[in-house]
UniProtKB/Swiss-Prot annotation:
Keywords: Disulfide bond, Electron transport, Oxidoreductase, Periplasm, Signal, Transport, TTQ. Its main location: periplasm. Belongs to the aromatic amine dehydrogenase light chain family. It comes from Paracoccus denitrificans. GO terms for molecular function: aliphatic amine dehydrogenase activity; methylamine dehydrogenase (amicyanin) activity. The gene is mauA. Its EC number is 1.4.9.1. This is Methylamine dehydrogenase light chain. It catalyses: 2 oxidized [amicyanin] + methylamine + H2O = 2 reduced [amicyanin] + formaldehyde + NH4(+) + 2 H(+). Residues 1-57 form the signal peptide. Heterotetramer of two light and two heavy chains. Methylamine dehydrogenase carries out the oxidation of methylamine. Electrons are passed from methylamine dehydrogenase to amicyanin.
Length: 188
């Protein structure tokens, strides 16, 4: 009990000293500065080089860019190196009963999307792909891909593939299942 009184006395002396040496305006000013600083934190750039390096560590030779190994193909749509999957981060819906443009039965399409420009090696053109999440069931676990071509940091959410976009799906289907990759048009 005696220790509590010493602690109380110490806190009281400290608070009285702070109150005697500072004004309300300075406290409010410092509080406002801190709140502004906290609000600006999401605008700071995000470095993802370590994440890309870990994802490609087994395949990339030492001293090379891990993304340099990305060679798109136009044959197997369930493979991660299929040209439309250049910026997908999740599971390909074609492996779960869906297709490149349709969600599997029973899942709901999220209203929001993120976009990327992917190169088609067959016709030599780049296309704008609007990745959209299918929601409502647990993650399928089939055909997981982590491709980061053209991905931008999280503070540009329309180009970030790390966000689960299921918040806009109908019936409050908030559980991520897989991602579709329809073509929006040619990229110029």
């Amino acid at each position: 009990m005696l220790g509590n009184f010493r602690f109380d006395d110490m806190v009281e002396k400290l608070s009285r000293r702070v109150a005697g040496q500072t004004s309300r305006r300075s406290v409010i000013g410092k509080l406002g500065t801190a709140m502004l600083g906290i609000g600006l934190v999401p605008l700071l750039p995000v470095d993802r080089r370590g994440r890309v390096s870990r994802a490609n560590a087994a395949d990339a030779p030492a001293g090379t860019d891990p993304r340099a190994k990305w060679v798109p193909q136009d044959n197997d749509i369930q493979a991660c190196d299929y040209w439309r999957h250049c910026s997908i981060d999740g599971n390909i819906c074609d492996c779960s009963g869906g297709s490149l443009t349709n969600c599997p039965p029973g899942t709901k399409l999220a209203t929001a999307s993120w976009v990327a420009s992917c190169y088609n090696p067959t016709d030599g053109q780049s296309y704008l792909i609007a990745y959209r999440d299918c929601c409502g069931y647990n993650v399928s676990g089939r055909c997981p891909c982590l491709n980061t071509e053209g991905e931008l940091p999280v503070y540009r959410p329309e180009f970030a593939n790390d966000i689960i976009w299921c918040f806009g799906a109908e019936d409050d289907a908030m559980t991520y299942h897989c991602t579709i990759s329809p073509i929006v048009g040619k990229a110029s």
